[in-house]
Amino acid sequence: MSGFGLAGPPPAPSIPGWTHLRTGKVRDLYTNNLNHILLVASDRISAYDWVMPTEIPGKGAVLTQLSLFWFDLLEDIIPNHVVSTDVPDEVEDRAIIVQPLEMFEIECVARGYLTGSGWSEYQQNSAVCGNALPAGLLDGSQLPTSIFTPATKADVGDHDINIDFNSAVKIIGADDAQTLKNLTIKLYETAAEFAQSRGIILADTKFEFGRNSEGEVLLGDEALTPDSSRFWDQSTWKPGGAQPSYDKQFLRDYLVASGWDRNSPPPELPDEIVEKSALRYEEAFFRITGSKF
C-alpha cells in the first residue's frame, strides 16, 4: 500500500467556473468550458511513493513560480503548455492555465551526476538504464557526459521504473523516443549551465512532454523544481556520499532515520522538519532566480 493511505486523496477545493478532473500526489487538475486545464500545485509533499500527511507551507507556490521561470528561460528550445497565469484568486501564485496535452507515456530523465537510483544501478552493473559508465565512479560523481534515463509512468502510489532507451522505443516508438531524448538532454544541459552560474549543480531532472491538438510536441507538467530535480550547492560538492541539497532529499533522509516502515502510512512530520523543508524550497527559488520568494 502507498499513495495517500487509507484516508485517500483530500477533497479538491471548489473553484467557481472550473470542474475538478483529478487529484495527483501534488497537483489538482480542473477544466473549464474553453477546454483549458487549471493546474494547481498544492502544498502536499511525497516521498517513497507516499504522500505525507503534513503539508509544507508555500511549497505549491514555489513549484509553480519556479516552473514559470524555467519555462520562460527554455522557450527557445521547446514551447510549453502554459496558456495564462491569470488564475482564480483562490489559487493565486500556485496555479497556471495550460493546454490539454496527450502526454507521452514515459518520464524523461537526464542525469549529469551519479546518485539515487542511478547510483544503485551502477553498483550492480556499471551502467544506468543501458548507458555504460566507466569504473570507479562514486555516489555524487560527475558523469563523463549527460545521459538519458527514461522511466515508466506510475499511478499514484506506484513506483516509476527506470528503463533503457530500447524499452522507451517499444512504448512510444523510435522517432518520438529519439526526439524526446534529444530534447531532454538539450534542456538539461542548458538548465545545468544556467544553474552553475548561480552556484548550483543540477545533478538530474525529470521532464514530461505531450502533444497538443495540432500535434505539436510541448513541454508539460513542471520544469526543474525541487520536486523533479536534484539541486546541490556547488561549493560543498564532494563525491563519495550524500550531497547537501535544495530538494526533497532532506525529507527522505529524515524518514529513513526515523525508522518508518515504508509499507505503512507515513507519520505526521515534526514542525522542525516542515519548517526546514519550506526553507529549502524557498532557498532553491532564491538561489536559482535571484529573487526572494
PLM features per residue range, with description:
Residues S2-A154, D261-E268, E272-F293:
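Active-site loop/lid in soluble adenylation, ligation, and acyl-transfer enzymes
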Residues V26-Y30, K206, E214-E216:
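Conserved beta-strand/loop block within the catalytic cores
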Residues H36, M103-E105, G199-L202, E214-V217, ...:
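Coil-to-beta-strand transition motifs
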Residues R94, A195-N212:
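A short glycine-rich, hydrophobically flanked beta-strand micro-motif that places a catalytic Asp/Glu
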Residues Q142-A174:
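A short mid-domain helix/strand-loop element embedded in enzyme catalytic domains
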Residues I172-A203:
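A long amphipathic alpha-helix within ATP-dependent nucleotide-binding catalytic cores
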Residues E208-K248:
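Catalytic activation segment of kinase domains across protein kinase-like and atypical kinase folds
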Residues G241-R262:
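Short glycine/proline-rich, acidic loop/turn segments that cap or connect secondary-structure elements
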